[in-house]
């Protein structure tokens, strides 16, 4: 029989034992948890490996999905990361894209705890993938840095997602008739290389409107604006069958700022500069020649430089027409100056012929001498010197005037005549040259014009007044009419020593100065015509829809 004192001690020991047992169980559980997690993880990895091995077990990547059965449908979409540049000379464009393809391969169905198997590019080589290629691509590059930029995913129902990062250089046919106000639709065409549409077709993943995405920040174009894109599909026939071709059109419109600064404004300023020559005097031949030649050379340089940024097309562009018309205006300004100079020279030649027409020559009439006692002495020599003879007459007249103041007029007059005739030696008169010869024409004219003019009254009465004294009346009667005839004859002698019917012209020939009528018309006609051309040109091309249609490229 157990005593009452031992009962509490037994109960206490039982409670301690239960607590120790619980502690030991907890310690055992804690020691077994890491191993169990690792085991579960090991079991999960083994499950994925088992799943992939089971998928590839007996899988032939040389055969398309549904081989021999239904058509394989490949859904595609494109995300553009960078668009540009666009080369007009090469007629191509470059862009970076994420090219996505989706199809269903029932051979890759699986059952597992994970919805999507996210795999790397190593799996791509072990399964079938579409043989998509870009029909108008000149060069396509798949990026491999730092590893091949490829994404591959398998879903439970066998749907495959395959994404690649590509840089594509594709052909862009351009018709540059409206250059630089043109717009282009650059296509990107892709399809199957080997499978006809009876085996594989392409469709858009998100429909025609949203399957191609081009963010605004992705377009880095200098000469173009990317205004949108459209998609389409078509069937192409070949000797191997009919193939489905998917096409994306990127619509580009050219920016005109560069060409306005580089070509249009310089051409307009050159034409205006060529028309400044119309306001320069037509006698300034060097200045107008420099204007014309400089502007023609400038237009030639501009036309050559404008073609550097274009392919060597065989047709004329809108810029070519503008440059050609500007060149025609500049060249016409040079031709206009040539015409002005030509007609001015003709007018000057006609004026010179009128003013320099030689006067009608008349034979010199012999001077008739009055009969007086000294006539036999003077007729002994036919070549009497007119200048010496005139000086002798003037000297005799002066002596007679001095003697008139102290003596009788009639007696001293006869004495003067005798002294005058005696004072001239016969040998001197005989040796004197002909006063009307060419050599002595100038001297004779000077001597005769130095004589005082005689009025009709003095000629008739033989009396001529003097400043210091009055001449003899008898001397004027004897020599007055002769002196008058000599002076009249000398005044009719021209510069060549010949007698002329009319005196030489006093006004100089016209120099052709002034403004030409051609210049007056050109000052109005050229600017008005050039302004009208610019108005028509810009109205036509700016209001015209120059964007290429997508249908024209198909």
UniProtKB/Swiss-Prot annotation:
Residues 36-259, 306-318, 541-554 are extracellular. Residues 502-511 have a biased composition (Pro residues). Its main location: membrane. Potentiated by histamine. The keyword Ion transport applies. Residues 281-284, 342-517 are cytoplasmic. It comes from the Eukaryota. One of its GO terms (molecular function) is transmitter-gated monoatomic ion channel activity involved in regulation of postsynaptic membrane potential. Belongs to the ligand-gated ion channel (TC 1.A.9) family. Gamma-aminobutyric acid receptor (TC 1.A.9.5) subfamily. GABRA4 sub-subfamily. Alpha subunit of the heteropentameric ligand-gated chloride channel gated by gamma-aminobutyric acid (GABA), a major inhibitory neurotransmitter in the brain. GABA-gated chloride channels, also named GABA(A) receptors (GABAAR), consist of five subunits arranged around a central pore and contain GABA active binding site(s) located at the alpha and beta subunit interface(s). When activated by GABA, GABAARs selectively allow the flow of chloride anions across the cell membrane down their electrochemical gradient. This is Gamma-aminobutyric acid receptor subunit alpha-4. It comes from Homo sapiens.
């Amino acid at each position: 029989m157990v005593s009452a004192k031992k009962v509490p001690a037994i109960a206490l020991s039982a409670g301690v034992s239960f607590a120790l047992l619980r502690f030991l169980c907890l310690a055992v559980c804690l020691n077994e948890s890491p191993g169990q997690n690792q085991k579960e993880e090991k079991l999960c990895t083994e499950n994925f490996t088992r799943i992939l091995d089971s998928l590839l077990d007996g899988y032939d990547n040389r055969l398309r999905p549904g081989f021999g059965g239904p058509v394989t449908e490949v859904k595609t979409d494109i995300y553009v990361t960078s668009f540009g540049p666009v080369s007009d000379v090469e007629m191509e464009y470059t862009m970076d894209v994420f090219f996505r393809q989706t199809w269903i391969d029932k051979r890759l169905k699986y059952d597992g705890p994970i919805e999507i198997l996210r795999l790397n590019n190593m799996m791509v080589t072990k399964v079938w993938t579409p043989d998509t290629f870009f029909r108008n691509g000149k060069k396509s590059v798949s990026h491999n840095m730092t590893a091949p930029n490829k994404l591959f995913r398998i879903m439970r129902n066998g749907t495959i997602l395959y994404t690649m990062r590509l840089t594509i250089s594709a052909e862009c046919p351009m018709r540059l008739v409206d250059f630089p106000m043109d717009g282009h639709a650059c296509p990107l065409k892709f399809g199957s290389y080997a499978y006809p549409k009876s085996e594989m077709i392409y469709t858009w993943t998100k429909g025609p409107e949203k399957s191609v995405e081009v963010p605004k920040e992705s377009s880095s174009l200098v000469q173009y604006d990317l205004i949108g894109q459209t998609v389409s599909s078509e069937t192409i026939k070949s000797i191997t069958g009919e193939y489905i071709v998917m096409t994306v059109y990127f619509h580009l419109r050219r920016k005109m700022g560069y060409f306005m600064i580089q070509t249009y404004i310089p051409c307009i300023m050159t034409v205006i500069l060529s028309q400044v020559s119309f306001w320069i005097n037509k006698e300034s031949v060097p200045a107008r020649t420099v204007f014309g030649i400089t502007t023609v050379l400038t237009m030639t340089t501009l036309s050559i430089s404008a073609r550097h940024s274009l392919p060597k097309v065989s047709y004329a562009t809108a810029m070519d027409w503008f440059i050609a018309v500007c060149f025609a205006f500049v060249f016409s300004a040079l031709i206009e100056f040539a015409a002005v100079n030509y007609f001015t020279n003709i007018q000057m030649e006609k004026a010179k012929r009128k003013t320099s027409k030689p006067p009608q020559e008349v034979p010199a009439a012999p001077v008739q001498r009055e009969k007086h006692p000294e006539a036999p002495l003077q007729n002994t020599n036919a070549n009497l010197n007119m200048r010496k003879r005139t000086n002798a007459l003037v000297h005799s007249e002066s002596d007679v005037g001095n003697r008139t103041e102290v003596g009788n007029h009639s007696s001293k007059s006869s004495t003067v005549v005798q002294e005058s005739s005696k004072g001239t030696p016969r040998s001197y008169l005989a040796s004197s040259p002909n006063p009307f010869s060419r050599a002595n024409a100038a001297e004779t004219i000077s001597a005769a014009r130095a004589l005082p003019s005689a009025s009709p009254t003095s000629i008739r009465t033989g009396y001529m007044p003097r400043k210091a004294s009055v001449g003899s009346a008898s001397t004027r009667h004897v020599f007055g009419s002769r002196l008058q005839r000599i002076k009249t004859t000398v005044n009719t002698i021209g510069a060549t020593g010949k007698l002329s019917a009319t005196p030489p012209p006093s006004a100089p020939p016209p120099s052709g100065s002034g403004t030409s009528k051609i210049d007056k018309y050109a000052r109005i006609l050229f600017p008005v015509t050039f302004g009208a051309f610019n108005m028509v040109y810009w109205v036509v091309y700016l209001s015209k829809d120059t964007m290429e249609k997508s249908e024209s490229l198909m």
